[in-house]
Structures are given as C-alpha cells and as structure tokens.
A protein has these predicted regions:
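A short, well-structured edge-of-sheet supersecondary motif
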Residues: 1-8, 227-228
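Preference for short coil/turn "hinge" residues that link or interrupt alpha-helices
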Residues: 7, 13-16, 100, 116, ...
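Short active-site loop at a secondary-structure junction
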Residues: 7-27, 31
Length: 314
C-alpha cells in the first residue's frame, strides 16, 4: 500500500520555470508587511527661494514593476505643485535599494533584447521596454508605419521594412544590443500588423532620461544631465515632494495572470529588503527567505536549488 507501481526519473531535479513565481509570491505574501505598496518617491535636500530650488532633486526607486507613462506624468504633476521653475542643483536617481546586477543568475545573455528579460533596477519605467507596433502600408512595396510606446528621445528607430514584399526578407525586431545601444531596428517584409516588446539598455537611465525630459516639458529648467546617488535621509533639509504608490494586488495580478518575470523579481528584491532591512539587496537575500518558508512547511531546503524569483534561469 502507498507504494509506487512505476517511477520514471522520480529523483530528477527539474527546472521550475514559471512555477517558481508561485514560491516567490507565496513567500512575499506571508510577511507581515506584505500589503505595503511599491513606492516611487521624489525628494529634495535644499530650499526654495525666488522660484528656484537651491538644492538637489532625488528620485528614489522602490522597484515598482508597474510604473508606466501615466505614473511618470502623475509623479511630475505633484513635483510641479511646488513653487519653483528652476533647479539650481543636480537631479539624481537613487537606486540604492538593490545591487547593480541587472539580470538574474543563469539568465541567458542572448535572450536580450526580448521584452521578457528587462534590465532590473529599483527605477523601472514601462517595464524597461518599448512596445513597437508595425502596420503595413496600403501600397505594396512601401515602407510600413512604425509607432513606439512610451515616447522618449532615449532611443532611436531605424525602419527598414517593406509592405507585402517577400524579397525584403523575414520580418524582425531587434536592437543594437551587442554594443548596449538603443537603436531599434525593424526590418523585413510586413504582411500584417505586428507588435512586440523590446528591452532597453539600461533601465534606470531610461527612467531618469524620461523624467528630466518630461520635467522640462512642464516648463522646469533642469540640469542638462542626471546622476545616481543615495538620498541623504539624515539631512535636516530633506523633504518629500511626491510619491507614486502601486498596490501589491496590481503587481500580483500581472505576476500570476501574465507570468511576468519583472514582477516576480520585484517581489524577490522587496522580500529581501523587508527581511534584512538593508540597502543594496541581492537576489540571494530574497532566496534565503524562500528557503526559510520551505523549511517551515516541513521540507528540506537542501532538496531545492533556487536561482531567481521568476524561473527564467537556465
């Protein structure tokens, strides 16, 4: 009784693939602070005098994987309610929540520039990807129409398509990823509407470039460039100017309904940050918490090898 009649590779360890997302989500939701939203904040460390912010502006990333174009606009609308139109200082992105490794352990380098493998950062804008839509012309042989979302001057587009022209070659989306460039190349024969997501290098710079671009669009005079630095929270002058919150439920829905790799990694990073209370969190900090839950459930963590939060690892 209770004995197997036949086994085949019963002891073989298999890749979890996207079922890994279940372990990550369950562990994250088991924590007391599980319902804390994913936050993106803007702070300054100076004073506002005569229409000028005398000090630095900081955008503090909380690894919100659902921060999109609308979120960016809403954050900026809050910032411009403050009585200044000139920033006499620097604009910084604070990505100190996480270490600098932008891919998970065992992720395939040649999966880039696929949208399902973005460059991970506490500052994510539109999932670190651009959605490209290609529509054939009404005239055979004409160049197809290409549109991209979100709009940003951070990337460029090269359109080498032909409408319903077989000798134009196989249709393809790509990016000059071998040189970490952000020129999106769309080429080949377009016989019908095509859509795809392409990742952008690199995510925090994509975020900050677009943030400055849209601030200027609202009439704010900003520095020409941005940098990366940690918010000096112990300074008496620091003040929060704006905050965007994304609910855990929204992040979870995208994770479980759409099997979103980015959302799983965001949960893993936040899990590590909540458990350790430290900065520069590594994936291993979150994985340790998953292993602890496995033990609490009566299993031996030594029977499992966990490499990331989403199951993309090879």
């Amino acid at each position: 009784a209770k004995k197997s009649l036949y086994n085949y590779r019963a002891e073989k360890l298999s890749r979890p693939a996207s079922t890994m997302k279940l372990l990550t989500a369950i562990t994250a939701l088991s924590r007391p602070e599980a319902n804390e939203p994913f936050r993106t904040e803007v702070w300054h460390d100076g004073v506002i005098e005569h229409d000028t912010l005398q000090g630095n502006l900081y955008v503090v990333g909380g690894f919100d994987p659902e921060f999109d174009s609308q979120s960016m606009d809403s954050l900026i609308e809050e910032v411009i309610t403050f009585p200044f139109s000139v920033i006499n200082g620097q604009v910084y992105g604070d990505v100190s929540m996480k270490d600098s490794l932008y891919w998970g352990s065992g992720w395939a380098w040649d999966d880039t520039p696929a949208g399902y493998q973005p460059y991970l950062s506490p500052l994510m804008f539109c999932k670190g990807t651009v959605q490209v839509s290609v529509v054939p012309s009404t005239v055979q042989g004409d160049t197809a129409s290409v549109s991209c979302q979100p709009l940003s001057s951070y990337y460029t587009v090269t359109n080498q398509t032909k409408t319903r022209t077989s000798f134009a070659g196989k249709f393809s989306f790509t990016r000059d990823w071998l040189t970490n460039g952000n020129n999106l190349l769309i080429s080949g024969n377009v016989a019908s509407i095509r859509k795809d997501d392409v990742n952008i290098y690199d995510s925090p710079r994509f975020f900050m470039h677009t943030f400055l671009e849209r601030l200027r669009g609202k009439g704010i005079t900003t520095p020409q460039s941005y940098g990366f630095a940690e918010l000096p929270r112990d300074s008496v002058r620091v003040e929060r100017m704006a905050c965007w919150n994304t609910s855990v439920q929204k992040v979870l829905n995208q994770l479980m309904k759409e099997s979103d790799n980015l959302n799983a990694e965001a949960f893993l990073c936040r899990l590590g940050a909540q458990a350790t209370g430290k900065k520069q969190v590594a994936a291993e900090d979150g994985i340790v918490e998953i292993m602890k839950l496995i033990r609490r459930l009566g299993h031996d963590p030594k029977d499992y090898k966990i490499a990331d939060g989403c199951g993309l690892s090879n």
